[in-house]
Structures are given as C-alpha cells and as structure tokens.
Amino acid sequence: WIGDAESREVVNQYAKAFVETVRASGGNNPNRCIMVTPYAASSSRQNMEALEVPQGDDKIIVSIHAYLPYSFALDTAGTDQYTSIDSSITTLFTDINEVFLSKGIPVIIGEFGSVNKANTEARVQCVKDYLSTAKQYGVPCCWWDNGTRIGNGENFGLLNRSEGGWYFPEIVDAI
C-alpha cells in the first residue's frame, strides 16, 4: 500500500491527466468537484505527501481510504477489541490537516469501517471515536459497505440489501 517513488509518480501523472481531461470536456465539468487519490488511496503520510494536487483548481478533493486502527478495523486475524481512541486515528487526521487541509485542500475519507468480528460494541466505539476526530477537522467520511457481513474476509456490510434493513443498527446509529 506504500508503493515506490515510480508508482507514486504514475499516480500523479494520472491525476493530472484526469483533471485536465474532465476540465476540458465541456458542460459543467469546468466547475464540477472531482476527487484524486494518493497512491492506492493510502493514508500513509508518505503517500499523502507525494500526491501532487493539481494547482489553480479549487474544486479538487483528495480522497483517502483509512481503515484504522488496522489490526482492529481491517486485519481479519487481528484483534476484535477496541476500548479507547487509538493513536493511529489521531495521527491520521493530524497528517491530513498538515498535508492538505492547512493548504486549503479538502479531503474526504472515501472508505473507512471495521470488519465484523462479532464485536458490535467495539465497532460502535471505534466509529464514534473515528467520526468525532474527523469532525474536529471537518473531514467527511464514507463507511465502506461491501454487502458482506459474515464469513472470512472483509465483512463491512451494514445494509441488508435483500430485506431492506440494517445488520448492525447500532453502528448505523453511531454514524
């Protein structure tokens, strides 16, 4: 998820071409908000600092994916315990502020969440801490709901698409 200098440069070239293409395509596109991501949409400070946000365009938003704390939120073999705000969450938003927000560049967390490990209460506490920290910095966040809630792997599902209800209403209420 960190990549190397060459990979990060390819992403920068892609972002530049993307912005130029959208802006030149007519219609409302010169005024449309569009998003760019660091390499792998990674929340690593190294990748955020390497992102070259196109200059002179106040409608560019940086989108980052951040599943934190990793061992709790994304690592399926990791811990199912979460009891208090984790330093990785505060570090993320401090980094976002220093790298982007302080320079007038808006950021959205395009993906966040925590996998289902039969630990709803811990997930509720984590989402409350995550979102309250994000709110302090004015960063909106989108829970990644991939429709899966049980089994091995990345189970982020909240919405029961078949029956039209919530698998974990407590988490939805916390959001």
Where are the language model's segments positioned?
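Aromatic-rich peripheral "rim/lid" segments of glycoside hydrolase catalytic domains that contact
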Residues: N119-I175
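Generic hydrophobic, helix-prone segments enriched in Leu/Val/Ile
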Residues: F18, L51, I89, D129, ...
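Active-site region of glycoside hydrolase catalytic domains
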Residues: W1-G78, T94-S114, Q136-Y137
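Alpha-helix initiation/capping motif
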Residues: S42-S44, I85-D86, S114-V115, Y167-I171
